[in-house]
């Protein structure tokens, strides 16, 4: 995940609620909140190719929001969706790279 963030070529989406995203998120990620409307989700996906790899994450491995957003993406034709299971909690705990650890949007 650290490499993906540093390369900044793969879209990374935070599936948590907007208030959690605003509190802090993985550097370079955008919100694709579980509570957002279909229209809001489609707006966030503009310009992303259907075959481009997309990473989705949630709070932790016990959070199902990333699974629901991944299903939404697949249903809408995005074929290369992966879930970062450790989520924000793992990223923040490990602070993989202080320069790219956690940012506020």
Feature names for model-found ranges:
Residues 22-56, 60-105:
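Rhodanese-like catalytic fold shared by cysteine-dependent sulfurtransferases
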């Amino acid at each position: 995940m650290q490499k993906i963030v540093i390369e900044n070529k793969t879209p990374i989406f935070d599936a948590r609620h907007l208030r959690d995203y605003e509190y802090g998120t993985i550097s370079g990620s955008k919100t694709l909140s579980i509570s957002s409307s279909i229209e809001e989700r489609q707006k966030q996906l503009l310009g992303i190719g259907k075959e481009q790899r997309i990473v989705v994450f949630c709070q932790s491995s016990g959070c199902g929001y990333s699974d629901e957003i991944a299903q939404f993406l697949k249903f809408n034709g995005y074929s290369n969706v992966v879930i970062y299971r450790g989520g924000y909690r793992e990223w923040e705990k490990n602070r993989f790279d202080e320069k790219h650890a956690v940012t506020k949007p």
